[in-house]
A protein has these predicted regions:
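Extracellular, repeat-based ectodomains that mediate carbohydrate processing or recognition
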Residues: 1-122
C-alpha cells in the first residue's frame, strides 16, 4: 500500500482525534494545505473549526497533525508538518482545553520551530 501524496488518511496516526475533559478535538489539513483544529463538546455538540496560520510544506502522507493536552495548565498542543523537516508547533492559551471559551485562532500562539531553547529539525 502506498500513501504517496495523501494526507489525513494515515493508519499510523495516533493523536489526530483526542478526547479530554468533556471535549473532543480533531486535526487535519484542508485541500489548500492549511492546518485545521476542531472541537466539540461531548456527547453530541456540533463541531467548531479554526484554521491555524500554517500551510503544509509537502503533500507527504507522514505529515500528520498531532494533538495533545497538558493536564497541568489546560493548553492544547499542536505539532504538524514534521516529516523530514523542522518542527512546526503551536499551543493554545492556558485553560482552553477545559473551558467553553470561544474557539478562535487568536487563542493560539504563533507557529514556532522550537521547544523552549531547542530548535528541532533545522
Amino acid at each position: 500500500m502506498s500513501y504517496d501524496g495523501l494526507v489525513n488518511v494515515d493508519s499510523f496516526q495516533q493523536s489526530g482525534v483526542l478526547t479530554y475533559s468533556g471535549w473532543q478535538y480533531a486535526g487535519w489539513y484542508t485541500s489548500s494545505k492549511y492546518a485545521i483544529v476542531a472541537r466539540r463538546s461531548l456527547p453530541s455538540g456540533g463541531w467548531k473549526t479554526l484554521q491555524l496560520p500554517h500551510q503544509l510544506s509537502v503533500s507527504d502522507s507522514h505529515n500528520v497533525v498531532a494533538l495533545g493536552v497538558s493536564p497541568v495548565d489546560g493548553k492544547i498542543h499542536v505539532a504538524m508538518d514534521c516529516h523530514s523537516t523542522q518542527l512546526y508547533y503551536v499551543s493554545s492559551e492556558a485553560g482552553l482545553a477545559t473551558s467553553g471559551a470561544s474557539w478562535t485562532a487568536d487563542r493560539f500562539g504563533s507557529v514556532i520551530n522550537s521547544l523552549g531553547n531547542l530548535a528541532i529539525g533545522r
